[in-house]
Every structure is written in C-alpha cells, then in structure tokens.
Amino acid sequence: MKAHLLLFMRIIYIHRCPLNEVAPPGQVVEVFGKAIQALSRVSDELWLDPSEKGLALRSVNSCRSAYGCVLFSPVFFQHYQWSASVKMNDTDIILNLNCRLGMKSILPIFRCLNSLEKNVEKCKIFTRSDKCKVVIQFFCRHGIKKIHNVCFQGSRPLQVIFQKNMCANTLVIQPRVLAEAIVLFTSSQEEVTLAVTPLKVCIKSSNEESMDLTDSVYSEMFVGPDEFDFFQIGIDTEITFCFKELKGVLTFSEAIHAPIAIHFDFPGKPMALSIDDMLLEANFILATLADEPSRASSLQTLYLSQKQRRSEPIHSNSKAGKNITSKVPEYISRKVEPKRLYSNETPTNISTLENCGSPLMKRANKDITEVPESDGNLSEVPESSVSDTEDVPGSPCLKKFSCMFFGAASSDQQEPFSLPFQSLATASGSEEDMNNGSFSTF
C-alpha cells in the first residue's frame, strides 16, 4: 500500500537565516503546530490537502463562513511525497483522497509546542489510506519515539474565491505592533471594530452602546500611518469583525516573524488577513458586520466620490530617505521611523440595561451559495436568489452578520491563493469553548 502523503520535517527549513544557518527541527514543528492552532480558532475540523504546490491545511466553520488556509511549500519539508489518487487494496476503486480530521483529535498533539521544540529531532507524517488513518511520529532525544494515529474521513476540501487585491483599503503591519494595539481587549471580547482614515487607524471595542455592567470598559487604540509597512486607504470606513480569528492569525504571525496584510472594503463585505512568507502562505477570510442598507449605499457613493478625488497611490522610498512630496496622496505611506502608540480607554456609564442588544443588522445580499445538484456536486446560485438573514448563535445580543456560502468544493487540485476570493463569513464560536463544538459536515 503506497502512502498517500509522506512528510519529513527536520533541519532543512530555513527562515530568515543566513545561508549557512538553519532553523532547529523543533522550531519547524512549532511553526506547523502554530498553523494548526490558528486554524482551530476557525473550525472544529481540519483538512489535509496535498498537491504539487505543497501541503495545504484548510479549515472552515460549521456555518461555512470563516475560512482559513495555510499552504506549506514542498521545500518547507525535508521530504515531501504525495499522490493524486489512491488505489484501495481490497477494491479496484481509485479515490482522490483528502483527509478531514477532527480538531479535537489533532490539536492535543501539537498543544505543548514548547516541549516539542526542545525535544523533537524529526517529525514524520504519512497516511494509511487502507485504514483511514493519519500517522504522526515524533523522533525525540534519547531515542524516544512517539506515534499518534488519527482517524480521518475522505472529503473534498473547500475552495474559496475572494479577490483581495481589489479591496479599497490595504494595511500591512508587523505582529509586534498589532499585538500592542489589541493588548487592551479582554479575552471575553467577541468583536472589535477597525476604523480607518487617511490620518490614523483606530482599533476599538465594538457596540459601545450595548455594553452592560459586566463589560463596562470601552477601549480604543490609535495607530499612526508611520507604524505600518504599507498604508493605503481608499475609503474612510469602519468594519466590525470577530476577534477570535484575529488573535489566532496574530499568534501564527509572531511565530514566523512575518507581517500581516489586512484587506477590506465596506461594512458587510468580507475582509482578508494574509501572511506571505518565503516557504508558506496563509489566508483567512472573515465576515464583517453588515450595516443598514441606507448606510451601505451611502458608503458606496462616498467611495466613488473619494476614488475620483484621490489619485493612484505613489509609494515613498523610506530606505532612500526620500520625503513625501505634495504629489503623493496622503492616504498611502511607507513605514518610516516608528512612533509611540497612544491609547484612549474610558469607562462607560450605562443608564439602562433593558435593551442591551446591538441594533439589528441586515444581511448583505449574497453573491453565491452552494446547493446540492442531483449528482451530488455543488453549483453556484445567482445573487438575486439569495436574500435571507441568519442569527449568530451563542450571542445574547441580536446581531446579523453578512454571510454567504463559499464556492463549490472540488477534488481538482487548485492553487488556493492564485484564485480571487469572493466570500463572506460569520463569527465562529468562543475560543474558550473550542472543544465543546460538534464536527461540521459538508
């Protein structure tokens, strides 16, 4: 029986090191484990999707909303071997096998990353298609060998289409700066609001008017344009999104010391958090809270007017020491000398607690959704045929998140990041209750 997937992770992984230096094997396993931990904040299930482009780890929540994908290049591993199809021993059926794992099964294996970093010398991952198992072997010091067998189900991975490069606003920030900006928020914070103008960026607590006595602190953090590696604002806007997935992406970004790119447009449109490194690429698509239709239409009108006034972005060269001239628009900037962040944190007085729910938000019109065809495949539905609303479960306040189903799942191997994304996502469940959720099915 030929293994469907065979991986070795050892010392060949080079990450921001001189050519004569390599990262220790434990650090490679730590990066792999951090990716799994980040995806665990999205869903209770994990897909292993091998291809000639590398190994993709995918995750999507039970509502087919929040989506995450981390693609490891083949050179990330010491040895990478995969097959597009597998022939079972007892039958002549050839299957295009992709592994869907329960997060409850695989997450404990990579939970204690500090111990793995110190003790693991080599990690080997391969599949036993005849027994529907993924075998994870750790070769540790002093000849200790740990073997984990995780059962999987054959399932086609989900493909998401979203054209993030067409977003009006793009921010690129170092994880150190972003971690300092969100340190004021408590672990119970469910959503945060990102407000941007050409002069500053504000990250603040969402739903100030709906807070009760148990959550009566309203926090704001202002970040200047000079703190960003890249700063482009095409429209002044405010978006509210789930805080849980953001923390997972930030933790993963800190592990590989790579900046985070944020792409977004109007409220109700999806936002993308992406990490592009030498040997891996990560993309997370999150929902934003949909505004009232009247406000959304006014924002679109404002965007068109601002687009006419603002010229194409001209990048400043901070390395050459060139100053920004009057020809450079104020809404785009490259990183210069870092400045201190300044915060504004004030307690909020609550006069009444009768109506603590946030205003009713209507779902934006969906672009595509998935419906089963007679042959079991998935097809696209036009935008005009979808116009319902959906409540966010587990929240005491009435909120409506703009949501639509992702593109049809396909067994064809496609590059997950060469295609544009066009999906919206809803907030996932609480991270503290991660192990209580049931596995979703597609």
UniProtKB/Swiss-Prot annotation:
Species annotation: Bos taurus
GO cellular component term of the entry, any: checkpoint clamp complex
The family this protein is said to belong to: Belongs to the rad9 family.
Source domain of life: Eukaryota
Keyword Transmembrane included in the entry's annotation: no
Subunit field text: Interacts with HUS1, HUS1B, RAD1, RAD9A and RAD17.
Pfam family, one: Rad9
Chain residue ranges for the region called Disordered: 370-392, 422-442
Organismal lineage: Eukaryota, Metazoa, Chordata, Craniata, Vertebrata
SUPFAM superfamilies linked: DNA clamp (SSF55979)
Record keywords, A-Z: Phosphoprotein
UniProt gene name: RAD9B
Phosphoserine: residues bearing it: S387
Protein name: Cell cycle checkpoint control protein RAD9B
Disulfide cross-links: none
Annotated InterPro entries: DNA_clamp_sf, Rad9, Rad9/Ddc1
GO BP: cellular response to ionizing radiation; DNA repair; DNA replication checkpoint signaling; mitotic intra-S DNA damage checkpoint signaling
